[in-house]
Amino acid sequence: MSTSAMELLLTATIFCLVLWVVRIFRPQVPKGLKSPPGPWGWPLIGHMLTLGKNPHLALTRLSARYGDVLQIRIGSTPVVVLSGLDTIRQALVRQGDDFKGRPDLYSFTFISDGQSMTFNPDSGPVWAARRRLAQSALKSFSVASDPASVSSCYLEEHVKKEAEYLIKKFQELMAGPGHFDPYRYVVVSVANVISAICFGQRYSHDDQQLLELIDLNNEFGEVTGSGNPSDFIPILRYLPSATMDTFKDLNRRFSVFIQKMIKEHYKTFEKGHIRDITDSLIEHCQDRKLDKNANIQISDQKIIGIVLDLFGAGFDTITTAISWSLLYLVMNPRIQKKIQEELDTVIGRERQPQLADRPKLPYMEAFISEVFRYSSFMPFTIPHSTTKDTSLNGFYIPKGCCIFVNQWQINHDQKLWGDPSVFRPERFLSPDGTVDKALSEKVTIFGLGKRRCLGEVIGRWEVFLFLAILLQQLEFSTSPGVKIDMTPIYGLTMKYSRCEHFQAQTRPFVLKCPEA
């Protein structure tokens, strides 16, 4: 046999072998269903180059071509990407049990030593019980009323204190340098709110321990948002990685801080005198009961995981929302003035805004909804996974498949919004001036279904109250001639480049009679 014939035979054999291996490992698609469509990908790396620096934009473009259910590969891992409000609601709400899982990603095992409630792949009874416990504790020390305070609830009391501090601080900075970076101060105030709820403790704005913790959280968002190749290319786990080393270290330090706070709470814990979320969780841990039949227990390690999840998520998301809000206010003075006119008319200046004022401030609510939509600062949910073989829109999705949910695409879908690239709060107002609830509920930023963010209600309330108190007293602008870079920086939460050129002037007092 000639050499060329041998080479041809060898090539054909290898091709057949590869084809056989692919067929063996490819899930068998049930009759009547199809595999999700998607673009051609490179060997070994799949579509990693296609995603680039802004995966939300790349996947939005792909969804326009391939539809609301498409499949890509990241490394050797198949990933199904969901877009479109109806499709995502179908998956996460109507078929919520099928899509409530978390992928067992390598990097997730280092968050809370694998005990994180948010990132852990468990989606069974223990996870559900932990989630109910966390939800109950969060409600008890945020939206529940505080009998010792004139505020309507614990959250309102904490936010008012921090907002008052911010007003004073911004005024001091204007009297000094004459400009400032609001993020530097907002993040500490928001962190203090969740710290008071979780630990019953407020920190100084110069406290090095808290500032270090904030830096760790920012790093976490950057590293997690940029993706970890070893999650999808297993062989990389055994090779040196500076990014992975950083990720492990910041999670270790974050856990050490939370463990320290919990140990201090154990030392001073008094049954019947529950001071904060940590005390509430310790009480449940000592009772060893999570359900009415006492079948599910919670360990000390899982307490750390719950507190870490609540604390970490409790200030990054809200700080980012407030930061984008301030940016859009200085870029749109007309909108800022309209919000302040509404505040003056409804509340006046004799008292601070309260949570009870929300229904009477529709333009403020419309503005916040537009901030959430336009910025889409959480472009994706944390990845989901399927808990069983299922189908969606006629496409077969096997058990354990990693699912990306593109929230950015929903919030910029021209079919939903008409002019998604225009910042226009009025879109959320009905002709009679009230909030169009049906439309505002289409804004997707906190996820949907069984994995929906636990703190969504608290987050919305907190953003509203901070902004209302600040805008009642201050008018925000930027230094003359300064241009702000509004380009979002991709991450777990998308932020804009820090800017030192914000200004705030105390609003002149104009006596107006508030509405009855």
Swiss-Prot record:
SUPFAM superfamilies: Cytochrome P450. It is found in: Endoplasmic reticulum membrane; Mitochondrion inner membrane; Microsome membrane; Cytoplasm. Pfam families: p450 (PF00067). InterPro entries: Cyt_P450, Cyt_P450_CS, Cyt_P450_E_grp-I, Cyt_P450_E_grp-I_CYP1, Cyt_P450_sf. One of its GO terms (molecular function) is heme binding. Induction: By 3-methylcholanthrene (3MC). CDD domains: CYP1A. Residues 25-36 are annotated as: Mitochondrial targeting signal. Substrate binds at F220. GO terms for biological process: amine metabolic process; estrogen metabolic process; hormone biosynthetic process; hydrogen peroxide biosynthetic process; lipid hydroxylation; long-chain fatty acid metabolic process; phenol-containing compound metabolic process; progesterone metabolic process. Keywords: Cytoplasm, Endoplasmic reticulum, Glycoprotein, Heme, Iron, Lipid biosynthesis, Lipid metabolism, Lyase, Membrane, Metal-binding, Microsome, Mitochondrion, Mitochondrion inner membrane, Monooxygenase, Oxidoreductase, Steroid biosynthesis. Constitutive expression of this enzyme in liver may be related to the sensitivity of guinea pig to TCDD. This is Cytochrome P450 1A1. The gene is CYP1A1.
